[in-house]
Amino acid sequence: MHKPHLTLLLSALFLLIPALEGNSCTNVIITKGASKDGSTLVTYAADSHYLFGELYYHPAADWKPGSLLKVYDWDSGKYLTEIDQVPHTWQTVGNMNEKQVIITETTWGGREELMDRRGRIDYGSLIYIALQRASTAREAIQVIVDLANEYGYASEGETFSIADKNEAWIMELIGKGTNIRNGVNMEKGIVWVAMRVPDGAICAHANQARIGAFPLNDPDNCLYAKDVISVARKRGYFDGPDEEFSFKKAYGPADFGTVRGCDARVWSAFNILSGGWFSYYDAQGRAVTKDASDFLDYAMGYNLDGDLPLFIYPRQKVSVKAVADVMRDHYEGTPMDMTQDIGAGGNALPYRWRPMEYQAEGGTYLNERAIATQQTGFWMVGQARDYVPDEVGGILWFGTDDAATSYVTPIYTSITEVPDCFRQGNGDLLHYSPTASFWINNRISNACYKMYNIMAPHVRKRIDAFETEQMERKTHAVDSAAIVLYNQVVDKLREKIESKRDAMVSRKPFAKVTRYVTDYTVRTAQEQFAAWVSLEEELLVKFMDGNVKPQNEDGTFKHSEYTEGQPAKVEWPGYTDLWKETVAREAGEVLKVKE
């Protein structure tokens, strides 16, 4: 593979930095036909240096006529406006609601001139308001469109994952600019397109627009703004025939920075889930299978004439655990693997601190941006299941901080109480809380960063044990017991429920069900939090000062022959060969042992 010309690097990196140093996130979408158990799955890493990891919770509510909802910018907390409330809002838990609708996002910026300077609904508010108002993915798309067009869109170009228990969509949108006449923005609203992910396929996006050409007469699978093409023509972004129009080329054109820093993460997710072979349908509808390496020059930003397919078909059915593990990727085993150069230090650290670029020897260079990253606020796998009642079907697998050293725990979306470790207000970025998940996960991740190749595998073993037990055994047992309770209620109230199934049936008859899953959710989250507090103490004792103290099978520490307060022989793992060779080369004359 060739290296990009230095001039290209210099110019493109200036575009890379603003996009990646704000909110840079990653989503993977798994349709129910592509998942191992028939679930719809959506992952989300909410990555930001300014986001505290906590679980947003809003119970269902009925609202009187004239009620208003205050809208605040999700990123900054700035007050934007107030809007009319609807008669009934669904319960929301994080980025899911009680009807098993999931909405997540990644921001790609796009053309600066399309910002609506008078917009009053930001992208975060669109997500959480739509979750309160929509019972299906298609309804959510319409809610988002209606809100943005009525109140004006206050954010940059955005990609949403929008899914429910039956289907999944990728939606992209951006404003139309600011043109004030008589105090009114004549360009208020959004241009947008939404495409249904074919059942059996998967999709991913990571801060770069993904939708290219799209079908103009297939409303079952593609929805779009009537003026999505005409606005591009008016702005001079496009002048070809309608059927050749590409949303991403018009509104979010790629450059080195957006590809290397963003689409490379999509490539990596596809590479993992496809087993290294991308199977997809091309623009002519032909089945194609190509080696993932065929797309690597594009993913690394070397050949911007390339592209990635929007959808691919995985090598095998994808489990919740498998897609959660994708969120822990650091480009291992690829040319972008950060452990393979001296930037990884002496312990193969797969992270690079910000900023995203640096200057050396007259050139500008980048720090890689992998899926797993240090500045994650919270991350999740949303699981929606059409074969289980809504009171049991939705599970938000939720975690905080860096996905590579943190776990996700099951949060049923019908809960009536949030675990204290995830509770809003339990700490923030400037105030430490010993009872907050975000802070204990940061203590563990930051401990691992100092001796990563030695400590992180120890943590990963605990993560895998917990998640495997929950995903493959324990939640199945909870589901079964909860469904028994649900069926008992249905048998008693069948006539009443059947007559109101499509209306707003009170959830009170299912209180036993929701109490059961709430108890399990809270107990599991708090017990695992306590286990992580103990793990952080164990890491300190075990790996203090670069030593590795041996442990027994039960986790206790081995002690010396003479006293229980002194460890048995400690190990000194030292540094990687790469580090030793580099230090010897750079400082050998000073450090070399003389014979």
For every predicted segment, state its role.
Residues 25-123, 143-313:
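A contiguous strand-loop segment
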Residues 340-483:
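Substrate-recognition/cap regions that form aromatic- and gly/pro-loop-enriched pockets
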Residues 1-9:
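Bacterial N-terminal signal peptides that target proteins for export
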Residues 115-117, 125-134:
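Second-shell loop/turn segments in exported
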Residues 9-19:
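Bacterial N-terminal signal peptides
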Residues 276-359, 369-371, 480:
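Accessory, solvent-exposed terminal regions and/or long lumenal/extracellular loops of proteins
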Residues 463-595:
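Histidine-centered catalytic/metal-binding microenvironments
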